Amino acid sequence: MKKLSLIWISLLAVFTFVGCSDDNEVEYNQSSDVTVAVPEVTASTGTSLTVASSVTGNTGSIVRRGFCYSANSQAPTVNDNMVEADENFSATISGLMGNTTYYIRAFVYGNSRYTYSDALEATTESQPIDEQLANYVAPAYEDNYTSIADWTNRSRWNLSNVHDPSVVLAEDGYYYMYQTDASYGNAHMAGGHFHGRRSKNLVDWEYLGGTMKNLPDWVVPKLNEIRKEMGLEPTTADEADFGYWAPCVRKVRNGLYRMYYSIVCPGTLSGDGTWSERAFIGLMENSNPANNDGWEDKGYVITNASDRGLDFYVNASADDYWNENCYYKWNAIDPSYIIDNDGRHYMAYGSWHSGIALVELDEATGKVKAELPDPWGTDADIAAYGQLIATRQMGNRWQGSEGPELIYHDGYYYLFLAYDALEVPYNTRVVRSTNIAGPYVGMDGTDVTTVGGEAFPILTHPYKFNGNDGWVGISHCCVFDDGEGNWYFASQGRFPVDVPGINASNFIMMGQVRCIRWTEDGWPVVMPERYGAVPQVEITESELIGNWENIDLSYAYGEQKTSATMTLAADHTVTAGDWEGATWTYDSSKRILTLDNGVELYLQRETDWEASPRTHTIVYAGYGDDYKTYWGKKSK
């Protein structure tokens, strides 16, 4: 469990914020001596709403008045978005998205407290898509969120402090996101586990809080039950040292949502000279994720399994320490839950160790369908703990692959994999199969199920465009769709190590959502720039002429891939860059740019996050006939 132990220690080593409390003085309506009227809309456009309110009571104490608004939070505060009101208690809220509903509250401040009105729901007018693009306002939140990283600022986090996200689209139209317990400065430790947030537009996210208050009651008894059967003493681990990792949330049907989660037990099996303690995967259910306190724990699902009997002692002088000493065959973290085309329920899981395993689940209970024997013995003894569906090297017990994400699309099951260490080198691969149990095969024909090998293509990799520090650690993804044919890739991105002026910069972890497009051959490509709700106006051929920042996303362990200039000329030739001398054609109906050297690029309008101020741009992602991945962005 290299991933788990090293990162948990590292996170605890980062400086800890002090003074985190709930005394966030933005929500005071109790016993107020003023009454604020619900706002009214006096004018609206596709990008703005003009609103007015009034206040009665002890108005002499009021020193400030205004309006706060949000597309997500139904009770926005001044920690969301806010505009000051004029002397008539009126204001224009600008920079809004067209045909979008906002929640708006009027507020006043006096006597050291805020008083709010009830919320108004107001919708901006629809705009022609060309006008939407012309009026586009990019997301304003800062990637360097250190100034708001502490617990008292959690209502302002948006996508700050996110790691290993899992996203589900619920019946109420919200996307709900849940995550590993990790944050800059360990701010999350003030508020439970498996923290949630939600969004209507995948850009603005409302923080909801922890879904689990304490270590589940079943964990320590189950751990001690297994330890007793192994001939070991009960655990003496401190509850504060357990890890809470990598939830997977899915909608099973209307009124039923399941969250599979990982609990990592601290310590070793029997002191120095023995292997690490095990992990568990458990299950929670909820009928409505809008009720963040409604997650009911359903208990134990599965644990680590070893094919080495009770031989958990390590040889410190082993030539290949991790591979030779690794006690477990399967590591019970990083669950991914799927219902296949025949209505059968499965869970893929695994991190490092021998690779990724698949088990069938009982539809009614969500637990493993087969009866689970003791989690140690021979390979045959532990067969119920899963079958291998992906490995980087057959027989290697310590390989950098984890975070499986299993989805179905257009005739194939796609298995997304996180490769290498998560701090910097993390990168994402994908393989596919027509059968949920495999064999899973990469774009280059490598069978990672029955033979083993490196999975291709690469979907994400450490990178940077010009004028920016870029991102590393971009993996452990969730893949989801909006029900209307649009697919998304959510993961964390981390700042590189030692960014000047930022303490512990690599512990800045930002939730990131990117668009997925599917190639003509059915492979996913992930856009390089993060999703920012840019209107998808047709991309014309004339817009492609000029310079691009092109990134060759070929694998290089721990290296941030940088961009080089690539120029498309009006005569359909490439006049600069690695593809100089090639010719190109463009299919505007499919938004596909094809070069005669075998490269096929899929275009999309996205936010230019590196620009100042941020704006919209055109990006691409695609593959060459050598299975290389390319990312690019149009230069301004």
Write out the residue ranges for each language-model feature:
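Short, surface-exposed linear motifs at loops/turns and structural transition points
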Residues: 22-127
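Carbohydrate-active catalytic/glycan-binding domains of CAZyme proteins
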Residues: 23-25, 126-636
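C-terminal motif of bacterial Sec signal peptides marking the signal peptidase cleavage site
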Residues: 16-19
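Positively charged n-region of N-terminal signal peptides that target proteins for export
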Residues: 1-5
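Sec-dependent N-terminal signal peptides
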Residues: 6-11
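N-terminal leader/targeting segments
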Residues: 12-14, 426
